[in-house]
Amino acid sequence: MAKFIMVVGTSSNSGKTVLVSGICRMLSNKGYKVAPFKSQNMSLNSRVSVEDGEIAVAQYTQAMAARAEPSVHFNPILLKPKGNFVSQVIVHGNPYEDKDYNEYRSKKDDFLVKIKESIDYLDKNYDYVVIEGAGSCCEINLLNDDIANLKVAEIAGADAILVSDIDRGGVFASIYGTVQLLPENWKKLLKGFVINKFRGNIDVLKDGFEKIEELTNIPVIGTIPYDETLVLPEEDSQALDGKRVFGNLKSPIEVNVVKFSKIANFTDVDPFSSDCLMKYIDFNENITGDILILPGTRCSTVEMDLMKKYGMDKKILEFVENGGIVLGICGGYQALGKMLFDEDFSEGDVGTISGLGLFDMETTFGNKKAIKNSTGKISIFNQNFDVSGYELHEGYSVSNETPLISLSKGFGNCGDSYDGSFKMIGDSYIFGTYFHGILENFEFRNYLVNLARSKKNLSKIEDDTYAELFNENMDKLSKIIEENLDFSKIIG
Protein backbone atom coordinates (compact mmCIF):
# COMPACT_ATOMS: atom_id res chain seq x y z
CA MET A 1 0.00 0.00 0.00
CA ALA A 2 1.37 3.39 -0.99
CA LYS A 3 1.18 6.65 0.93
CA PHE A 4 -0.35 9.32 -1.33
CA ILE A 5 0.57 13.01 -1.02
CA MET A 6 -1.01 15.68 -3.23
CA VAL A 7 0.29 19.14 -4.09
CA VAL A 8 -2.41 21.58 -5.23
CA GLY A 9 -2.11 25.29 -5.95
CA THR A 10 -3.93 28.57 -5.53
CA SER A 11 -3.16 29.32 -9.20
CA SER A 12 -1.27 28.20 -12.26
CA ASN A 13 2.52 28.51 -11.99
CA SER A 14 2.39 28.50 -8.20
CA GLY A 15 5.19 25.93 -8.03
CA LYS A 16 3.38 22.59 -7.99
CA THR A 17 5.53 20.88 -10.61
CA VAL A 18 8.82 21.87 -8.99
CA LEU A 19 7.60 21.00 -5.50
CA VAL A 20 6.50 17.53 -6.63
CA SER A 21 9.89 16.98 -8.32
CA GLY A 22 11.73 17.98 -5.16
CA ILE A 23 9.59 15.80 -2.89
CA CYS A 24 10.09 12.85 -5.25
CA ARG A 25 13.88 13.25 -5.14
CA MET A 26 13.85 13.79 -1.36
CA LEU A 27 11.90 10.56 -0.75
CA SER A 28 14.01 8.67 -3.29
CA ASN A 29 17.15 9.82 -1.48
CA LYS A 30 15.68 8.26 1.68
CA GLY A 31 15.45 4.91 -0.07
CA TYR A 32 11.74 4.82 -0.89
CA LYS A 33 10.21 3.65 -4.15
CA VAL A 34 8.47 6.80 -5.39
CA ALA A 35 6.17 7.68 -8.29
CA PRO A 36 4.83 11.04 -9.48
CA PHE A 37 1.24 11.31 -10.68
CA LYS A 38 -0.90 13.83 -12.52
CA SER A 39 -4.32 12.58 -13.51
CA GLN A 40 -4.78 15.07 -16.35
CA ASN A 41 -2.21 17.35 -17.93
CA MET A 42 -2.54 19.74 -20.86
CA SER A 43 0.72 20.20 -22.74
CA LEU A 44 2.34 20.00 -26.17
CA ASN A 45 5.53 18.98 -24.40
CA SER A 46 5.49 15.20 -24.10
CA ARG A 47 7.79 12.20 -23.91
CA VAL A 48 7.52 8.45 -24.33
CA SER A 49 7.07 6.11 -21.38
CA VAL A 50 8.58 2.70 -20.79
CA GLU A 51 5.42 1.19 -22.35
CA ASP A 52 5.90 3.25 -25.55
CA GLY A 53 3.06 5.55 -24.53
CA GLU A 54 2.89 9.34 -24.49
CA ILE A 55 3.02 11.30 -21.20
CA ALA A 56 3.65 14.94 -20.33
CA VAL A 57 7.27 16.05 -20.04
CA ALA A 58 6.58 17.28 -16.50
CA GLN A 59 5.71 13.77 -15.29
CA TYR A 60 8.66 12.32 -17.20
CA THR A 61 10.98 14.79 -15.46
CA GLN A 62 9.39 14.04 -12.10
CA ALA A 63 9.99 10.34 -12.77
CA MET A 64 13.66 11.10 -13.36
CA ALA A 65 13.69 12.99 -10.06
CA ALA A 66 12.10 9.95 -8.38
CA ARG A 67 14.54 7.60 -10.14
CA ALA A 68 11.52 5.72 -11.50
CA GLU A 69 10.91 4.33 -14.97
CA PRO A 70 8.42 6.73 -16.62
CA SER A 71 5.03 5.03 -16.97
CA VAL A 72 1.72 5.91 -18.62
CA HIS A 73 0.23 5.48 -15.14
CA PHE A 74 2.07 8.63 -14.04
CA ASN A 75 -0.11 10.68 -16.42
CA PRO A 76 -3.16 8.69 -17.56
CA ILE A 77 -4.85 11.60 -19.39
CA LEU A 78 -2.85 13.98 -21.60
CA LEU A 79 -4.53 16.77 -23.56
CA LYS A 80 -2.60 18.17 -26.53
CA PRO A 81 -4.16 21.42 -27.85
CA LYS A 82 -4.71 21.53 -31.62
CA GLY A 83 -6.40 24.93 -31.89
CA ASN A 84 -10.01 26.13 -32.13
CA PHE A 85 -10.59 24.86 -28.56
CA VAL A 86 -9.99 21.25 -29.62
CA SER A 87 -7.42 18.93 -28.04
CA GLN A 88 -6.10 15.52 -28.94
CA VAL A 89 -6.91 13.29 -25.96
CA ILE A 90 -4.22 10.76 -25.02
CA VAL A 91 -5.41 7.98 -22.67
CA HIS A 92 -2.83 5.73 -21.01
CA GLY A 93 -0.29 6.83 -23.59
CA ASN A 94 -2.34 6.24 -26.75
CA PRO A 95 -4.34 8.64 -28.95
CA TYR A 96 -8.04 8.41 -28.10
CA GLU A 97 -9.98 11.14 -29.94
CA ASP A 98 -9.97 14.85 -30.69
CA LYS A 99 -12.49 16.62 -28.46
CA ASP A 100 -13.62 20.10 -27.54
CA TYR A 101 -14.35 20.98 -23.91
CA ASN A 102 -18.01 19.98 -23.92
CA GLU A 103 -17.30 16.68 -25.65
CA TYR A 104 -14.50 15.96 -23.21
CA ARG A 105 -16.65 16.86 -20.21
CA SER A 106 -19.37 14.46 -21.37
CA LYS A 107 -16.84 11.60 -21.12
CA LYS A 108 -15.59 12.62 -17.66
CA ASP A 109 -16.79 9.45 -15.95
CA ASP A 110 -15.01 7.27 -18.52
CA PHE A 111 -11.76 9.14 -17.91
CA LEU A 112 -12.20 8.82 -14.14
CA VAL A 113 -12.24 5.05 -14.59
CA LYS A 114 -8.84 5.26 -16.31
CA ILE A 115 -7.52 7.54 -13.57
CA LYS A 116 -8.64 5.07 -10.89
CA GLU A 117 -6.95 2.22 -12.76
CA SER A 118 -3.66 4.11 -12.60
CA ILE A 119 -4.11 4.99 -8.92
CA ASP A 120 -4.70 1.29 -8.15
CA TYR A 121 -1.59 0.33 -10.11
CA LEU A 122 0.58 2.86 -8.28
CA ASP A 123 -0.88 1.87 -4.91
CA LYS A 124 0.31 -1.71 -5.45
CA ASN A 125 3.78 -0.89 -6.79
CA TYR A 126 5.20 2.10 -4.86
CA ASP A 127 5.89 3.26 -1.31
CA TYR A 128 4.97 6.88 -1.99
CA VAL A 129 2.97 8.54 -4.76
CA VAL A 130 3.30 12.33 -5.08
CA ILE A 131 0.33 13.79 -6.96
CA GLU A 132 0.36 17.12 -8.77
CA GLY A 133 -2.83 19.12 -9.22
CA ALA A 134 -3.61 21.43 -12.14
CA GLY A 135 -3.97 25.22 -12.14
CA SER A 136 -6.06 26.44 -9.22
CA CYS A 137 -7.68 23.70 -7.15
CA CYS A 138 -10.76 25.87 -6.67
CA GLU A 139 -12.11 27.15 -9.96
CA ILE A 140 -15.70 27.25 -8.71
CA ASN A 141 -17.14 27.33 -12.23
CA LEU A 142 -15.38 24.04 -13.00
CA LEU A 143 -15.50 22.14 -9.70
CA ASN A 144 -18.15 19.65 -10.79
CA ASP A 145 -16.03 18.57 -13.75
CA ASP A 146 -12.57 18.89 -12.17
CA ILE A 147 -10.79 15.51 -12.33
CA ALA A 148 -7.30 16.93 -11.83
CA ASN A 149 -7.35 18.32 -8.28
CA LEU A 150 -8.86 17.41 -4.91
CA LYS A 151 -11.28 14.91 -6.43
CA VAL A 152 -8.15 12.87 -7.13
CA ALA A 153 -6.91 13.28 -3.55
CA GLU A 154 -10.30 12.05 -2.35
CA ILE A 155 -10.12 8.96 -4.58
CA ALA A 156 -6.53 8.17 -3.59
CA GLY A 157 -6.94 8.96 0.11
CA ALA A 158 -4.18 11.55 -0.16
CA ASP A 159 -3.14 14.23 2.28
CA ALA A 160 -2.97 17.52 0.37
CA ILE A 161 -0.62 20.51 0.51
CA LEU A 162 -1.71 23.89 -0.86
CA VAL A 163 1.11 25.92 -2.43
CA SER A 164 0.95 29.63 -3.27
CA ASP A 165 3.45 31.96 -4.98
CA ILE A 166 4.29 34.93 -2.74
CA ASP A 167 6.33 36.57 -5.51
CA ARG A 168 3.04 37.62 -7.15
CA GLY A 169 1.74 39.27 -3.99
CA GLY A 170 -1.47 38.60 -2.08
CA VAL A 171 -0.38 35.18 -0.89
CA PHE A 172 -2.47 35.03 2.28
CA ALA A 173 -5.59 36.30 0.53
CA SER A 174 -5.07 33.66 -2.17
CA ILE A 175 -4.74 30.92 0.41
CA TYR A 176 -7.72 32.05 2.49
CA GLY A 177 -9.95 32.59 -0.53
CA THR A 178 -9.10 29.16 -1.90
CA VAL A 179 -9.86 27.42 1.39
CA GLN A 180 -13.13 29.29 1.87
CA LEU A 181 -14.40 28.37 -1.59
CA LEU A 182 -13.63 24.66 -1.28
CA PRO A 183 -16.39 22.19 -0.44
CA GLU A 184 -16.09 20.94 3.16
CA ASN A 185 -15.16 17.38 2.17
CA TRP A 186 -12.20 18.66 0.13
CA LYS A 187 -11.20 21.32 2.65
CA LYS A 188 -10.62 18.53 5.19
CA LEU A 189 -7.97 17.00 2.91
CA LEU A 190 -5.67 20.03 3.28
CA LYS A 191 -2.94 19.36 5.87
CA GLY A 192 -0.66 22.33 5.30
CA PHE A 193 0.22 25.43 3.30
CA VAL A 194 3.49 26.10 1.47
CA ILE A 195 4.67 29.62 0.63
CA ASN A 196 6.75 29.53 -2.54
CA LYS A 197 9.41 31.90 -3.97
CA PHE A 198 9.99 33.97 -0.84
CA ARG A 199 12.76 36.59 -0.81
CA GLY A 200 14.04 38.17 2.41
CA ASN A 201 13.72 37.59 6.14
CA ILE A 202 11.11 34.98 7.01
CA ASP A 203 10.38 36.72 10.32
CA VAL A 204 8.20 39.26 8.47
CA LEU A 205 5.79 36.43 7.61
CA LYS A 206 5.29 34.98 11.08
CA ASP A 207 2.27 37.12 11.99
CA GLY A 208 0.70 36.05 8.71
CA PHE A 209 1.39 32.38 9.48
CA GLU A 210 -0.35 32.68 12.83
CA LYS A 211 -3.34 34.54 11.41
CA ILE A 212 -3.91 32.17 8.49
CA GLU A 213 -3.76 29.14 10.81
CA GLU A 214 -6.18 30.86 13.19
CA LEU A 215 -8.59 31.51 10.31
CA THR A 216 -8.37 28.07 8.66
CA ASN A 217 -7.11 25.65 11.34
CA ILE A 218 -4.46 24.61 8.81
CA PRO A 219 -0.76 25.35 9.47
CA VAL A 220 1.89 26.80 7.19
CA ILE A 221 4.31 23.88 7.01
CA GLY A 222 7.08 25.74 5.23
CA THR A 223 8.44 28.46 3.01
CA ILE A 224 10.54 27.80 -0.08
CA PRO A 225 13.11 30.53 -0.75
CA TYR A 226 13.44 32.03 -4.21
CA ASP A 227 16.58 30.51 -5.74
CA GLU A 228 17.64 31.90 -9.12
CA THR A 229 20.56 29.46 -9.36
CA LEU A 230 18.31 26.41 -9.79
CA VAL A 231 18.26 25.21 -13.40
CA LEU A 232 15.24 22.96 -13.96
CA PRO A 233 13.39 21.89 -17.13
CA GLU A 234 10.37 24.02 -17.99
CA GLU A 235 6.94 22.37 -18.15
CA ASP A 236 5.34 24.00 -21.20
CA SER A 237 5.85 26.61 -23.89
CA GLN A 238 4.28 29.41 -21.81
CA ALA A 239 7.64 29.55 -20.08
CA LEU A 240 9.12 30.82 -23.36
CA ASP A 241 7.01 33.98 -23.38
CA GLY A 242 9.67 35.99 -21.57
CA LYS A 243 12.59 33.70 -22.37
CA ARG A 244 14.91 34.89 -25.09
CA VAL A 245 18.56 34.44 -24.15
CA PHE A 246 19.70 31.74 -21.72
CA GLY A 247 22.31 29.05 -21.19
CA ASN A 248 26.04 29.68 -20.88
CA LEU A 249 26.16 33.43 -21.49
CA LYS A 250 29.97 33.41 -21.66
CA SER A 251 30.20 30.72 -24.33
CA PRO A 252 31.78 31.63 -27.70
CA ILE A 253 29.22 29.34 -29.41
CA GLU A 254 25.71 30.67 -30.00
CA VAL A 255 22.75 28.41 -30.77
CA ASN A 256 19.64 29.97 -32.33
CA VAL A 257 16.26 28.23 -31.99
CA VAL A 258 13.42 29.26 -34.31
CA LYS A 259 10.49 30.07 -32.03
CA PHE A 260 7.73 28.20 -33.81
CA SER A 261 4.15 29.35 -33.18
CA LYS A 262 3.10 25.88 -32.01
CA ILE A 263 6.44 24.72 -30.66
CA ALA A 264 6.44 21.27 -29.05
CA ASN A 265 9.05 19.45 -27.00
CA PHE A 266 11.05 22.65 -26.74
CA THR A 267 13.15 21.08 -23.96
CA ASP A 268 14.93 19.15 -26.73
CA VAL A 269 17.37 22.07 -26.99
CA ASP A 270 18.13 22.31 -23.25
CA PRO A 271 21.20 20.03 -23.33
CA PHE A 272 23.03 22.71 -25.35
CA SER A 273 22.51 25.24 -22.56
CA SER A 274 25.39 24.10 -20.36
CA ASP A 275 27.97 24.73 -23.11
CA CYS A 276 26.37 27.29 -25.42
CA LEU A 277 24.68 30.66 -25.40
CA MET A 278 21.06 29.98 -26.38
CA LYS A 279 18.76 32.40 -28.18
CA TYR A 280 15.17 32.02 -29.38
CA ILE A 281 14.52 33.95 -32.58
CA ASP A 282 11.17 34.98 -34.06
CA PHE A 283 10.31 34.48 -37.73
CA ASN A 284 11.17 38.08 -38.61
CA GLU A 285 14.56 38.14 -36.87
CA ASN A 286 18.03 37.54 -38.26
CA ILE A 287 20.04 34.39 -37.57
CA THR A 288 23.10 35.33 -35.52
CA GLY A 289 24.21 31.94 -34.19
CA ASP A 290 26.71 29.28 -35.16
CA ILE A 291 24.11 26.51 -34.93
CA LEU A 292 20.45 26.80 -35.96
CA ILE A 293 17.75 24.53 -34.51
CA LEU A 294 14.35 23.99 -36.11
CA PRO A 295 12.54 22.35 -33.18
CA GLY A 296 9.46 20.18 -32.94
CA THR A 297 6.03 21.65 -33.64
CA ARG A 298 2.42 20.55 -33.50
CA CYS A 299 1.82 21.90 -37.04
CA SER A 300 4.76 21.63 -39.47
CA THR A 301 2.86 23.03 -42.45
CA VAL A 302 1.72 26.07 -40.47
CA GLU A 303 5.30 26.83 -39.39
CA MET A 304 6.56 26.44 -42.95
CA ASP A 305 3.90 28.86 -44.15
CA LEU A 306 4.88 31.39 -41.47
CA MET A 307 8.59 31.06 -42.29
CA LYS A 308 7.80 31.95 -45.89
CA LYS A 309 5.51 34.80 -44.89
CA TYR A 310 8.15 36.47 -42.70
CA GLY A 311 11.21 35.60 -44.81
CA MET A 312 12.77 33.14 -42.39
CA ASP A 313 13.03 30.56 -45.18
CA LYS A 314 15.38 32.82 -47.15
CA LYS A 315 17.42 33.60 -44.03
CA ILE A 316 17.90 29.88 -43.38
CA LEU A 317 19.07 29.28 -46.95
CA GLU A 318 21.49 32.21 -46.63
CA PHE A 319 22.73 30.79 -43.31
CA VAL A 320 23.47 27.50 -45.09
CA GLU A 321 25.27 29.31 -47.94
CA ASN A 322 27.51 30.91 -45.31
CA GLY A 323 28.49 27.54 -43.81
CA GLY A 324 26.08 27.33 -40.88
CA ILE A 325 25.17 24.17 -38.97
CA VAL A 326 21.46 23.22 -39.03
CA LEU A 327 19.58 20.63 -36.99
CA GLY A 328 15.89 19.91 -37.57
CA ILE A 329 14.02 17.82 -35.01
CA CYS A 330 10.70 16.11 -35.87
CA GLY A 331 8.52 18.90 -37.33
CA GLY A 332 11.66 20.95 -37.90
CA TYR A 333 13.17 18.00 -39.78
CA GLN A 334 10.07 17.76 -41.99
CA ALA A 335 10.44 21.44 -42.91
CA LEU A 336 13.95 20.78 -44.25
CA GLY A 337 12.55 18.62 -47.08
CA LYS A 338 11.11 19.52 -50.48
CA MET A 339 7.41 18.89 -49.87
CA LEU A 340 4.97 18.44 -47.00
CA PHE A 341 1.80 16.71 -48.22
CA ASP A 342 -1.25 17.29 -46.03
CA GLU A 343 -4.25 16.62 -48.25
CA ASP A 344 -6.59 16.08 -45.28
CA PHE A 345 -5.44 19.26 -43.48
CA SER A 346 -4.51 17.19 -40.42
CA GLU A 347 -1.75 19.67 -39.54
CA GLY A 348 -3.89 22.79 -39.85
CA ASP A 349 -5.43 25.09 -42.43
CA VAL A 350 -2.40 25.30 -44.75
CA GLY A 351 -2.56 21.89 -46.42
CA THR A 352 0.21 20.81 -48.79
CA ILE A 353 3.19 23.17 -48.95
CA SER A 354 6.76 23.16 -50.24
CA GLY A 355 9.55 22.98 -47.68
CA LEU A 356 13.01 24.51 -47.48
CA GLY A 357 14.37 22.00 -49.99
CA LEU A 358 17.63 21.38 -48.14
CA PHE A 359 16.92 17.64 -48.19
CA ASP A 360 15.66 15.63 -51.18
CA MET A 361 12.77 14.41 -49.06
CA GLU A 362 8.99 14.38 -49.05
CA THR A 363 6.75 14.05 -45.99
CA THR A 364 3.16 12.82 -46.04
CA PHE A 365 0.82 13.33 -43.08
CA GLY A 366 -1.85 10.91 -41.92
CA ASN A 367 -3.69 9.79 -38.82
CA LYS A 368 -1.28 7.06 -37.72
CA LYS A 369 1.07 8.22 -34.99
CA ALA A 370 4.50 6.79 -34.23
CA ILE A 371 5.03 6.65 -30.45
CA LYS A 372 8.30 4.87 -29.75
CA ASN A 373 11.35 4.78 -27.56
CA SER A 374 13.99 4.37 -30.25
CA THR A 375 17.66 3.47 -30.48
CA GLY A 376 20.27 3.33 -33.20
CA LYS A 377 23.73 4.29 -34.39
CA ILE A 378 25.07 7.41 -36.08
CA SER A 379 28.03 6.78 -38.40
CA ILE A 380 29.40 9.89 -40.12
CA PHE A 381 32.95 11.01 -40.99
CA ASN A 382 34.52 8.02 -39.20
CA GLN A 383 32.52 8.90 -36.08
CA ASN A 384 30.23 6.29 -34.49
CA PHE A 385 27.70 7.12 -31.77
CA ASP A 386 25.09 4.91 -30.16
CA VAL A 387 22.04 7.10 -29.65
CA SER A 388 18.60 6.85 -28.10
CA GLY A 389 15.55 9.08 -28.24
CA TYR A 390 11.81 8.98 -28.57
CA GLU A 391 9.47 9.45 -31.53
CA LEU A 392 6.15 11.29 -31.53
CA HIS A 393 5.12 12.03 -35.11
CA GLU A 394 2.17 11.58 -37.43
CA GLY A 395 4.01 12.15 -40.72
CA TYR A 396 6.31 9.76 -42.53
CA SER A 397 9.20 10.87 -44.72
CA VAL A 398 10.80 9.38 -47.81
CA SER A 399 14.35 10.71 -48.05
CA ASN A 400 16.94 10.22 -50.77
CA GLU A 401 19.68 11.59 -48.53
CA THR A 402 22.19 9.72 -46.39
CA PRO A 403 20.34 8.47 -43.28
CA LEU A 404 21.51 10.01 -40.03
CA ILE A 405 20.66 6.99 -37.85
CA SER A 406 20.60 3.24 -38.52
CA LEU A 407 17.83 2.01 -36.26
CA SER A 408 17.99 -0.95 -33.93
CA LYS A 409 14.54 -0.05 -32.56
CA GLY A 410 11.97 2.49 -33.72
CA PHE A 411 9.92 3.67 -36.70
CA GLY A 412 12.15 6.41 -38.09
CA ASN A 413 11.49 8.05 -41.45
CA CYS A 414 8.93 5.58 -42.75
CA GLY A 415 9.44 2.27 -40.96
CA ASP A 416 12.43 1.37 -43.13
CA SER A 417 15.11 0.86 -40.41
CA TYR A 418 16.52 4.37 -40.87
CA ASP A 419 15.90 7.71 -39.25
CA GLY A 420 16.75 11.21 -40.27
CA SER A 421 18.96 12.61 -42.99
CA PHE A 422 22.39 14.17 -43.26
CA LYS A 423 24.26 16.11 -45.94
CA MET A 424 26.83 18.79 -46.50
CA ILE A 425 26.16 21.77 -48.73
CA GLY A 426 29.49 23.50 -49.25
CA ASP A 427 30.86 24.10 -45.74
CA SER A 428 27.43 23.74 -44.16
CA TYR A 429 26.28 20.69 -42.20
CA ILE A 430 22.57 19.80 -42.31
CA PHE A 431 21.14 17.26 -39.86
CA GLY A 432 17.55 16.09 -39.44
CA THR A 433 15.94 13.49 -37.19
CA TYR A 434 12.63 12.33 -35.74
CA PHE A 435 14.44 11.57 -32.47
CA HIS A 436 13.30 13.87 -29.70
CA GLY A 437 15.93 13.80 -26.99
CA ILE A 438 18.71 13.38 -29.56
CA LEU A 439 20.80 16.05 -27.82
CA GLU A 440 20.70 14.15 -24.54
CA ASN A 441 23.21 11.83 -26.21
CA PHE A 442 26.28 13.77 -25.20
CA GLU A 443 28.60 12.32 -27.86
CA PHE A 444 26.36 13.59 -30.68
CA ARG A 445 25.68 16.87 -28.89
CA ASN A 446 29.37 17.47 -28.36
CA TYR A 447 30.01 16.54 -32.00
CA LEU A 448 27.74 19.38 -33.14
CA VAL A 449 29.24 21.85 -30.67
CA ASN A 450 32.75 20.86 -31.72
CA LEU A 451 31.88 21.36 -35.40
CA ALA A 452 31.01 24.94 -34.52
CA ARG A 453 34.07 25.31 -32.30
CA SER A 454 36.37 24.03 -35.06
CA LYS A 455 35.08 26.77 -37.38
CA LYS A 456 36.38 29.26 -34.79
CA ASN A 457 39.63 27.36 -34.13
CA LEU A 458 38.53 26.53 -30.57
CA SER A 459 39.47 23.38 -28.67
CA LYS A 460 37.03 20.48 -28.34
CA ILE A 461 34.73 19.79 -25.39
CA GLU A 462 34.36 16.22 -24.16
CA ASP A 463 32.35 16.09 -20.91
CA ASP A 464 28.66 15.26 -20.37
CA THR A 465 27.88 18.43 -18.45
CA TYR A 466 24.09 18.37 -19.00
CA ALA A 467 23.36 15.06 -17.23
CA GLU A 468 25.52 16.13 -14.31
CA LEU A 469 23.72 19.49 -14.15
CA PHE A 470 20.25 17.87 -14.00
CA ASN A 471 21.07 15.62 -11.06
CA GLU A 472 22.97 18.34 -9.23
CA ASN A 473 19.96 20.64 -9.44
CA MET A 474 17.47 17.95 -8.43
CA ASP A 475 19.56 17.14 -5.37
CA LYS A 476 19.86 20.84 -4.59
CA LEU A 477 16.07 21.24 -4.88
CA SER A 478 15.56 18.23 -2.62
CA LYS A 479 17.84 19.76 0.00
CA ILE A 480 16.02 23.11 -0.14
CA ILE A 481 12.68 21.38 0.44
CA GLU A 482 13.98 19.18 3.24
CA GLU A 483 15.52 22.17 5.04
CA ASN A 484 12.55 24.53 4.67
CA LEU A 485 9.41 22.36 4.86
CA ASP A 486 8.09 20.35 7.79
CA PHE A 487 6.46 17.24 6.40
CA SER A 488 6.24 15.43 9.74
CA LYS A 489 2.43 15.71 9.77
CA ILE A 490 2.23 14.20 6.30
CA ILE A 491 5.02 11.68 5.73
CA GLY A 492 5.95 11.02 9.35
Swiss-Prot record:
GO terms for molecular function: ABC-type vitamin B12 transporter activity; catalytic activity. GO terms for biological process: cobalamin biosynthetic process. PANTHER family: COBYRIC ACID SYNTHASE, DETHIOBIOTIN SYNTHETASE. Belongs to the CobB/CobQ family. CobQ subfamily. The keyword rRNA processing does not apply. Keywords: Cobalamin biosynthesis, Glutamine amidotransferase. Coiled coil: none annotated. It comes from Methanococcus maripaludis (strain DSM 14266 / JCM 13030 / NBRC 101832 / S2 / LL). Gene3D superfamilies: 3.40.50.880, P-loop containing nucleotide triphosphate hydrolases. Pathway: Cofactor biosynthesis; adenosylcobalamin biosynthesis. Catalyzes amidations at positions B, D, E, and G on adenosylcobyrinic A,C-diamide. NH(2) groups are provided by glutamine, and one molecule of ATP is hydrogenolyzed for each amidation. Residues 252-444 form the GATase cobBQ-type domain. This is Probable cobyric acid synthase. HAMAP family: CobQ. The keyword Coiled coil does not apply. The gene is cobQ. The active site is at C330 (nucleophile), H436. It comes from the Archaea.
